[in-house]
Amino acid sequence: MTADRGSGESHGSVRPPVALAFASMGFAALVIFGLGMTSLATGEAVIATPGLGQVPGIAGVVCALLAFAGALWAAIGRAEERHPSFWGAAWTTAASFLAYIGGVWLGALFTGADLGVATGVAGRLATSWFGLAVAASAFVCAWSGIALVRTRARRPRWPWEDEYDE
């Protein structure tokens, strides 16, 4: 994982597929944590509509994770040819947020809710602290994934590890 691979590659010390895996796992963990802590802090359920069950929430997180991975890969996938921009974090955030809202909406429809209830649940999430928790999680993890690819840092070395030391 160090930058001195000897092949002359121009990307950072972490390859794009590895950065994508780390950032995606971090996003999944952080979005679940963020939704739970937001629920604890506000005293409200993430999906407060009775009878919907867990399917809309699961569908929303799965859709958000897939959108996150796709958008982040679009930002960092060709790092050998170009330097990835941190603007990719903004696009990844937008894609993840919209996919979460859309996934919850589709999940609510799948569980048998009518169109008005599904739209109400999705609208509440989009305009509440829960939507902000999803967007913030996506932004932090996308920024981190891009930073992993952009960095030119190498692993730390102690003075006695220098092979040219006398």
Question: Which role does the model predict for each range below?
Answer:
Residues 3-18, 66-93, 109-113, 138-165:
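Cytoplasmic membrane-interface segments at the C-terminal ends of transmembrane helices
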Residues 14, 19, 25, 38-39, ...:
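Alpha-helical protein-protein interaction elements
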Residues 22-26, 85-102:
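Transmembrane alpha-helical segments of multi-pass membrane proteins
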Residues 32-62, 103-133:
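Membrane interfacial helix motifs at helix-loop boundaries and amphipathic/re-entrant anchors
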Residues 20-31, 142:
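Alpha-helical transmembrane segments
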